[in-house]
Swiss-Prot record:
PROSITE patterns cross-referenced by the UniProt entry: AMIDASES (PS00571)
One of the GO BP terms on file: translation
GO cellular component terms, A-Z: glutamyl-tRNA(Gln) amidotransferase complex
The keyword ATP-binding appears for this protein: yes
Subunit (UniProt): Heterotrimer of A, B and C subunits.
EC number: 6.3.5.7
InterPro entries per UniProt: Amidase, Amidase_CS, Amidase_dom, AS_sf, GatA
Keywords: ATP-binding, Ligase, Nucleotide-binding, Protein biosynthesis
Protein name: Glutamyl-tRNA(Gln) amidotransferase subunit A
Catalytic function, reaction form: L-glutamyl-tRNA(Gln) + L-glutamine + ATP + H2O = L-glutaminyl-tRNA(Gln) + L-glutamate + ADP + phosphate + H(+)
Active site per the UniProt annotation: 74, 149, 173
Pfam families xref list: Amidase
């Protein structure tokens, strides 16, 4: 059922918020031993919040659009009084004294927190295997990864542990796990949603967005979290439209650009290619016009990203030194030794690798050759998108080059892991909105996702196209059996 359908049932008295929350907590308790999707479960808080919503409803009070609905939050978003660990030993005991803007808006709309979800440490990874608290598994097949870095949020929605969740997307960390777990994942335009209270990885790339079971639910969450925030200087002041209003509108005559380079990318799985091409044909059957477009520098995105993102991470993570908060090494001989040991023991291998890459790229003698050159290529990638949007309304690609890979498959090959974000990274570099929608299954029964990319602040059109495709394709009518997916 959609958020809208649950809201109507709650308003009609067909179910109480407490019953709805208890149902999802029961699913969470059943699936969590197999999935490890959560860092912390807030069952007591969830039940108390649900009871308060029921009491307010009985008293005839006005309630928010998400009143009594169980949601989960990626554990790199600050939640006052609830641990925010970034799945790192460095922040294992950190309890924020303040609430992030997006979670504050969710609680203001009446949403109920069921827990904080697992992620790759400090959101650096594509499989949710680098978490200090153990890897998350894919609900469709626990031998496979859920994607990353927001794998816990994607797995939580797919397993029915919550109605929807929030994640963050720096290079594909919402869309790729959405594809792997068979849910909808939306990365808004950079600046559409406040980053205040999001633990920073790469500040010019990070963006918060929703995971949901359907496009309409993603639109509902975006409606609540979008909008200007004075505490985030990068947050846009543009008005927030009604994202649900145009979902039912026809897409007849809309121009959908099929990016040539994405379907010619090295390593693109044949089943993924066929499934996404079939989805493009479905859009054409709905009246959209398919247009072949070229973004010549699209596949340069990954090399560009792995200079810019680690450089920003190197600067952002310099604050973790064991002095004011975070992990502190014991019995150090000096301040310098304490700082060095705290960082060596508090950060995992992947985080340390990216800090080293970024520090090198920013070092004297190399900053021009690497960091500034990468920023120039980033500008060229953005111009390619600008040129494409002169011809079309939305762009279409696969979300990921393959379905979910097996756990441990890329453990000794960081480059192979990085390539899982080949098709999502350019969108972050350009600051554009994009959504991953389930579009089929592999022969092994693993979900496949289609990525739709919109122009700046054109989330409404993106959601419209995604919703129309979702309704027509009815992908889950032929879904395979999976014991952990309701």
């Amino acid at each position: 059922m959609t958020i809208s359908a649950w809201r109507q049932r709650l308003q009609a008295g067909g179910v109480s918020s407490r019953e709805l929350v208890d149902e999802h907590l029961q699913r969470l308790e059943q699936s969590e031993p197999s999935l490890n999707a959560f860092v912390e479960v807030t069952a007591e808080r969830a039940r108390a919040d649900a009871d308060r919503v029921d009491q307010a409803r009985a008293a005839g009070e006005d309630l928010g659009p998400l009143a009594g609905l169980p949601l989960a939050i990626k554990d790199n978003l600050c939640t006052r009084g609830v641990r925010t660990t970034c799945s790192s030993r460095m922040l294992e005991q950190f309890v924020p004294p303040y609430e992030s803007t997006v979670t504050d808006r969710l609680w203001g709309a009446g949403a109920v927190l069921v827990g904080k979800t697992n992620l790759d440490e400090f959101a650096m990874g594509g499989s949710t295997e680098t978490s200090a608290f153990g890897a998350t598994k894919n609900p469709w097949n626990i031998e496979h990864v859920p994607g990353g870095s927001s794998g816990g949020s994607a797995a939580a929605v797919a397993s029915g542990s919550c109605l929807a969740s929030l994640g963050s997307d720096t290079g594909g960390s919402i869309r790729q796990p959405a594809s792997f777990c068979g849910v909808v994942g939306l990365k808004p335009t950079y600046g559409r949603v406040s980053r205040w209270g999001l633990v920073a990885f790469a500040s010019s790339l990070d963006q918060v967005g929703p995971f949901a079971g359907c496009v309409a639910d993603a639109a509902e969450l975006l409606q609540v979290i979008a909008g200007h925030d004075q505490r985030d200087s990068t947050c846009l002041t543009a008005d927030v439209p009604n994202y649900s209003a145009g979902l039912a509108a026809s897409i007849k005559g809309l121009r959908v650009g099929v990016i040539r380079e994405c379907f010619e990318a090295e390593g693109l799985d044949a089943e993924v290619k066929a499934s996404v091409q079939a989805s493009a044909a479905q859009l054409e059957a709905l009246g959209a016009e398919l247009v072949d477009v070229s973004c010549p520098r699209f596949n340069d995105g990954i090399a560009t990203y792995y200079v810019i993102a680690p450089s920003e991470a190197s600067a952002n993570l310099a604050r973790y030194d064991g002095v004011k908060y975070g992990f502190r090494a014991e019995e150090a001989e000096s301040l310098a030794s304490m700082t060095a040991r705290s960082r060596a023991e508090g950060f995992g291998a992947e985080v340390q690798r990216r800090i080293l890459i970024g520090t090198y790229a920013l070092s004297a003698g190399y900053v021009d050759a690497y960091y500034r050159k990468a920023q120039q290529v980033r500008t060229l990638i953005r111009r390619d998108f600008d040129a494409a949007f002169q011809q079309v309304d939305v762009l279409l690609t696969p979300t990921a080059p393959s379905p979910a890979f097996k756990a441990g498959a890329h453990a000794d090959d960081p480059l192979a892991m990085y390539l899982a974000d080949l098709l999502t990274i350019p969108v972050n570099l350009a600051g554009l909105p994009a959504i991953s929608v389930p579009c089929g299954f592999s022969a092994a029964g693993l979900p496949i996702g289609m990525q739709l990319i919109g122009n700046v602040l054109d989330e409404a059109r993106l959601l419209q196209v995604a919703h129309q495709y979702e309704q027509a394709a009815d992908v889950f009518a032929q879904r395979p059996e999976a014991s952990l997916v309701p």
